[in-house]
From Swiss-Prot:
This is ATP synthase subunit beta. Transmembrane segments: none annotated. F-type ATPases have 2 components, CF(1) - the catalytic core - and CF(0) - the membrane proton channel. CF(1) has five subunits: alpha(3), beta(3), gamma(1), delta(1), epsilon(1). CF(0) has three main subunits: a(1), b(2) and c(9-12). The alpha and beta chains form an alternating ring which encloses part of the gamma chain. CF(1) is attached to CF(0) by a central stalk formed by the gamma and epsilon chains, while a peripheral stalk is formed by the delta and b chains. It comes from Clostridium acetobutylicum (strain ATCC 824 / DSM 792 / JCM 1419 / IAM 19013 / LMG 5710 / NBRC 13948 / NRRL B-527 / VKM B-1787 / 2291 / W). It is found in: Cell membrane. Pfam families: ATP-synt_ab (PF00006), ATP-synt_ab_N (PF02874), ATP-synt_VA_C (PF22919). Belongs to the ATPase alpha/beta chains family. HAMAP family: ATP_synth_beta_bact. The keyword Glycoprotein does not apply.
């Protein structure tokens, strides 16, 4: 038997034990190929050396049909996936194989999915704002270039549309690229996203990688690394890349399943003892370098809404900003339904975004907080019972709240409203005018889904004429 070939000695679900010669044991994280016949190869990844020249591996696909005594080939390298321009517009699985039935892909380069994080010397230390063109985000919870953003929200509040608009804006305004990684979510959602991206025209600037709910835990645990590896290639070529991970909790969940299968003693709440280490290995690779940046937007599922659960708590330590989508705001018909008071950002700091931006954002938050406090009084007694000062504040707050809405390009075919990318300087100037009372005489309805303050005035003029 050739030196790099071993034999399967045990199969327990997705865990496959393989015996090699003592001198030729494969390294940890090496990929192992098992020939299943009918031109089908099963890939497994080495996780442990268990003694007696046996390695314990986790299969990336179902192990149906595996038998003891079957031959397994050590490839001598980790799982490697295609990178480069050719991956754009295509759908991949954890192994970098295309799953969109659009033919095979010829890739010039393959990168291993396990790679070191950039060194301190390579990293960019200058915090810089990442302009999204979405007013509520840019003003109140701005994203950092190379930062990590947590996206919180229940079903049907607009997470997917927000993600698509971000992909659209980075492609059209910054010429940037995106990688979408579906980790342990529903296959139907991935399918819908693919066709929606096709319809909205952003698919050619995006690579999609999926390891869905029905796949073995090994695939769900590693698929985030596959997407990240594709994004790293573009970053190292000088691009600004958006990396979407939906859902980061499923990455932890898959790691927990694998840990249990490997026989590790669980830690708090049944999670793997290596939770912080696994999360750190992924998150530390997502950063800005002197060449380019990877800005990551991660959907975060919070089990039972318990923020102290180890999985979300470990994720929070890595986040630079949070974007919280609120059902209350979507019920008001305001989209994007981003909660201006619950969303946060580490870079909303006068030294980074500038004094004027910081001041306007704080005033907007203050006026909305006060409006929230007054809502109980308004519900019981009505607006007329408020003092003149509070009545004026409520009027401005309602205008601000409506002006935080925005028409999206990717939703144009459903809403009939032309989408707008609003530069951050226009956003600041427009909100300043509302706060200074220059728009108190304009009707509230004119502020809904307007881009800049000039659009509001234009809409108000048309309303007056009609």
């Amino acid at each position: 038997m050739p030196e790099h070939v071993g034999k399967i000695v045990q199969v327990i679900g997705p865990v496959v034990d393989i015996k090699f010669d003592a001198e030729n044991l494969p390294d940890i994280y090496n990929s192992i190929e098992i020939d299943m016949g009918d031109n089908k190869k099963l890939i497994a990844e080495v996780e442990q050396h268990v003694g007696d020249d046996i390695v314990r591996t986790i299969a990336m696909e179902g192990t149906d049909g595996l038998k003891r005594g079957m031959e397994a080939v050590n490839t001598g390298k980790p799982i490697s996936v295609p990178v480069g321009e050719n991956v754009l517009g295509r759908l991949f699985n954890v192994l970098g194989q295309t799953i969109d039935e659009a033919g095979d892909m010829n890739a010039d380069k393959y990168y291993p999915i396990h790679r070191p994080a950039p060194t301190f010397e390579e990293q960019s230390v200058q915090p810089e704002m990442f302009e999204t063109g979405i007013k509520v985000i840019d003003l109140l919870a701005p994203y950092q270039k190379g930062g990590k953003i947590g996206l919180f929200g229940g079903a049907g509040v607009g997470k997917t549309v927000l993600i698509q608009e971000l992909i659209n804006n980075i492609a059209k305004e910054h010429g940037g690229l995106s990688v979408f990684t579906g980790v342990g979510e529903r296959t139907r959602e991935g399918n819908d996203l693919y066709y929606e991206m096709k319809d909205s025209g952003v698919i050619n600037k995006t690579a999609l990688v999926f390891g869905q709910m029905n796949e073995p835990p090994g695939a769900r645990m590693r698929v985030a690394l596959t997407g990240l590896t594709m994004a790293e290639y573009f970053r190292d070529k000088g691009q600004d890349v958006l990396l979407f991970i939906d859902n980061i909790f499923r990455f932890t969940q898959a790691g927990s399943e694998v840990s249990a299968l490997l026989g590790r003693i669980p830690s708090a709440v049944g999670y793997q003892p290596t939770l912080a280490n696994e999360m750190g290995a992924l998150q530390e690779r997502i950063t800005s370098t002197k060449q380019g940046s990877i800005t990551s937007v991660q959907a975060v599922y919070v089990p039972a809404d318990d923020l102290t659960d180890p999985a979300p708590a470990t994720t929070f330590t890595h986040l630079d900003a949070t974007t919280v989508l609120s059902r209350e705001i979507s019920n008001l018909g305001i989209y994007p339904a981003v909660s201006p008071l619950e969303s946060t950002s580490r870079i909303l700091d006068p030294r980074i975004v500038g004094e004027e931006h910081y001041e306007v954002a704080n005033k907007v938050k203050h006026i909305l907080e006060r409006y929230q406090e007054l809502q109980d009084i308004i519900a019981i007694l009505g607006v007329d019972e408020l003092s003149d000062e509070d009545r004026l504040l409520v009027g401005r707050a309602r205008r601000v709240q409506r002006f935080l809405s925005q028409a999206f390009s990717v939703a144009e075919q459903f809403t009939g409203m032309k989408g707008q990318f609003v530069p951050v300087k226009d956003t600041i100037r427009s909100f300043k005018e509302i706060l200074d009372g220059k728009c108190d005489d304009l009707p509230e309805a004119a502020f809904l889904f307007a881009g800049t303050i000039e659009d509001v005035k234009e809409k108000a003029k048309k309303m007056m004429e009609s």
